[in-house]
């Protein structure tokens, strides 16, 4: 079977809710990542077969095929470039990578951009469902769903609390994990570890035009006492805003190519895609599926967890990567080495390609060979992607 290669991977620096990227339309934010990956890779825009854009809240400014709109807003992509927008919840753009790789491995396409965008400031999380319910246009929970899951609330927060109880984590475990995320993100920023992946975004500020290049959510002065003092989201629970991923604006992109296209273009890949896995499980606890998806990915790849040099496990809530570590026995020093979504933000549909950008560049910088990325996703789904650095 033909191989699929990652040639380049980029992301914008994250913007806080109502922060430095809040003034940028998500279509233009996505176009920025598309243009950057064309410029940095040197790929001929005319050779791009498709753009697959992940986006969760596909309403308002992210409605009407945001992926295609981003292509049309791009400075560098011709209007003849096709695009599609997909929603696999938080794993949307990781699934975009997998669809891109599958297209290349099937031989039906040679050059595909997987990308993602989410402006959580301008299109708030859950707003698409809330709008329709407010207007009397119905609820996504059908009679059939209610029959199978009577009275169940589909809640990430409840799922996170269920993981805390199931795995016996103390609140202090969550707080310490969150502190480490900020500390690693601060160290990565100060050492310019993100320089190879971050693309500048032109913004307007009260001081005039600027370029946004630094992740806005990192608490450079984070302390355990400060994190521990944040109010609980539920009086009976353990999760706080400080141990949850940050609402974030951002976009990201990954260029996937076939070996045939690499030879024709003379471009050099960063990594080879080694395994593509997606599984689904309990939709109520919801966020635990990365544990079992990782088991399946390693089994199918014929690998053990110790063979993986770096892991990117999305920090939707602190108990998710903590449960993943406990289940897999992975070395915690290899996990989210530059921090995660607790510090850097979780721009929903953009997080999959964002994490891949961090993973492939970290593998290159650290001389690692294999990297594994996984994310929990709404509905109890999880993607796993294993890559080999080249």
Residue ranges and their predicted role:
Residues 1-27, 36, 165, 222-288, ...:
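Condensing-enzyme catalytic core mediating Claisen C-C bond formation in acyl metabolism
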Residues 158-161, 197, 205, 274-343:
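Active-site pocket-lining segment
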Residues 1-74, 85, 162-171, 181, ...:
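Conserved active-site "lid/cap" helical segment
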Residues 55-110, 150-155, 221-246, 327-354, ...:
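Conserved catalytic cysteine-centered active-site region
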Residues 86-118, 164-193, 254-260, 347-368, ...:
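Active-site-proximal alpha-helical scaffold in enzymes
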Residues 111-163:
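Flexible glycine-/small-residue-enriched beta->alpha junction loops
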Residues 10-12, 23-27, 31-32, 40, ...:
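N-terminal extracellular/periplasmic Venus flytrap/periplasmic-binding protein-like
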């Amino acid at each position: 079977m033909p191989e699929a290669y990652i040639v380049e991977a980029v992301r914008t620096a994250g913007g806080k809710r109502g922060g430095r990227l809040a003034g940028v339309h998500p279509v233009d934010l996505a176009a920025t990542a598309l243009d950057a990956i064309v410029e940095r890779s040197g790929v001929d825009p005319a050779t791009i077969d498709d753009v697959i854009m992940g986006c969760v809240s596909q309403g308002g400014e992210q409605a009407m095929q945001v992926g295609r709109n981003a292509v049309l807003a791009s400075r560098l992509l011709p209007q003849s470039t096709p695009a599609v927008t997909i929603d696999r919840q938080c794993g949307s753009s990781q699934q975009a990578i997998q669809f891109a790789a599958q297209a290349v491995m099937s031989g039906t396409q040679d050059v595909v951009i997987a990308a993602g965008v989410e402006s959580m400031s301008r299109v708030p999380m859950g707003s698409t469902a809330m709008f329709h319910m407010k207007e009397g246009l119905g609820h996504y929970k059908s009679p059939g769903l209610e029959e199978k899951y009577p009275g169940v609330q589909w809640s990430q927060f409840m799922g996170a609390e269920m993981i805390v109880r199931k795995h016996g984590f103390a609140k202090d475990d969550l707080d310490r994990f969150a502190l480490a995320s900020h500390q690693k993100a601060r160290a990565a920023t100060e050492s310019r570890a993100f320089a190879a992946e971050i693309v500048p975004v032109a913004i307007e500020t009260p001081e005039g035009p600027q370029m946004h290049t630094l992740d806005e959510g990192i608490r450079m002065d984070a302390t355990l006492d400060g994190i521990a003092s944040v109010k609980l989201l539920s009086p009976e629970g353990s999760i706080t805003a400080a141990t949850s991923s940050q609402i974030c604006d951002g976009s990201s992109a990954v260029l996937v190519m076939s070996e045939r296209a690499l030879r024709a273009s003379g471009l050099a890949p960063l990594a080879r895609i080694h395994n593509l896995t997606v599984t689904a499980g309990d939709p109520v606890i919801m966020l635990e599926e990365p544990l079992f998806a990782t088991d399946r990915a390693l089994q199918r790849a014929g690998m053990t967890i110790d063979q993986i040099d770096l892991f990117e496990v999305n920090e939707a809530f602190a108990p998710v990567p903590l449960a993943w570590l406990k289940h897999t026995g992975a070395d915690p020093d290899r996990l989210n080495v530059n921090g995660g979504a607790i510090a850097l933000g979780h721009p929903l549909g953009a997080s999959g390609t964002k994490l891949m950008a961090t993973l492939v560049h970290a593998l290159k910088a650290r001389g690692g060979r294999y990297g594994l990325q996984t994310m929990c996703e709404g509905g109890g789904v999880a993607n796993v992607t294993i890559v080999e650095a080249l």
